[in-house]
Amino acid sequence: MNQFYTAESVTEGHPDKLCALIADSVLDECLSHDALSRVACEVMATRGQIIVAGEITSLYEPSIPSIVRSVLRKVGYNPARFAIQCLIHKQSPDIAAGVDCSLEQRRNVDGSSPSLQLGAGDQGVMVGYACSETPQMLPLPVVLAHRLTSALTIARKSGAIQGLRPDGKAQVTVEYDEDGKPFRLDTVVLSAQHSPEIPADELCFELTDKVIAPALQVLPPDEDTKILINPAGRFVLGGPEADTGLTGRKLMVDSFGVFAPHGGGAFSGKDATKVDRSGAYMARYIAKNLVAAGLCERCQVTLAYAIGAAQPVMVEVDTFKTGTICADDCLADAVKLVFGLTPAEIIAKLDLLSPRYTGTAAYGHFGRPEFPWERTDQAKILRAAVI
């Protein structure tokens, strides 16, 4: 029986993503001056007001209002329309102590190896996913949804479509055949904020021609595909003026949609000692290398950590019965052999002290080759470890 799968994406002007961009911009500003900054930054944006709160311990003191105004300007909002409130304090000394000196170091495990120096900044479960469905090793609906919102933003910023405003969303439903392969585009939903002057029919034509058609070339609409453009009608009020935004409220957009569970920890605004972020990036890195190695067609990697401990308390691999050489527990053993999974090892392997996080905040954290966790440089080593 055929099945239908849906994924969504939002533009950088969506209020939740605006908050993520601000949070990661604060993080990057700190890291660019002090690579060892500890940052846990949360943002709320509502009509006329942006609140930045959280914990920052750094040798550098960022000018948060300046960062917020810069992000607003780049996204397309008028900074003069927002009051900015900052509620920042330093990281808890109790948490810092557990991160700076891990449980293993305190117990002198393995002679206090440097890889065991850092403890996890919190407990939690992180999930990574990969599949052979697309070149990005992501499910096709996820790829298409992000392409739509990216194309929408490009059309706005380039002036290819006049009258667009920053907020926008996309949703794509793809039909899969009995073999689990995507073969047909069932429904496309595109909501684009616009100026009141642009006629609805003109906007619909422009979005179809300059956003939907180029973004969906890999699986074009057919005569039965339902295309819904601004199905609620008028979309003039948008962004924080219409909806309150928060960091951490687009977890499935940031990751793998409905195709994989989420441990619940958000990414943006957190430095790499927070395994919510770094552990999720490593789990994706592992899953992608397992698929690239030809060891499975799709794969879910789950890691779990205890606060203050360096080594994960769980490493699990699930290939959904697509494994080609050995059982899933064998693959998990190979993962433990090939990959360093302590926070210090993850940070070093994926270069997570570099200020690159603003680029992750919108259009998905995965499937983009500019990020180190998207490399498949461990595929051959993994395969050799199994064989």
Question: What is the role of each PLM region?
Answer:
Residues 1-40, 45:
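N-terminal, positively charged regions that mediate nucleic acid binding
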Residues 12-31, 130-150, 270-294:
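Alpha-helical support elements that line or immediately flank enzyme active sites
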Residues 37-41, 168-174, 225-229, 295-306:
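A short glycine-rich, hydrophobically flanked beta-strand micro-motif that places a catalytic Asp/Glu
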Residues 8-10, 14-19, 118-134, 236-260, ...:
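Conserved phosphate/anionic-ligand binding catalytic regions in large, soluble enzymes, centered on
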Residues 6, 48, 66, 73, ...:
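Glycine-rich, mobile lid/loop segments that gate access to catalytic sites or pores
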Residues 46, 298, 306-387:
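Internal helix-turn-beta structural module
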Residues 43, 124-131, 170-194, 241-260, ...:
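Short beta-strand elements
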Residues 151, 198-292:
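Glycine-rich anion/phosphate-binding loop at the beta-strand->alpha-helix junction
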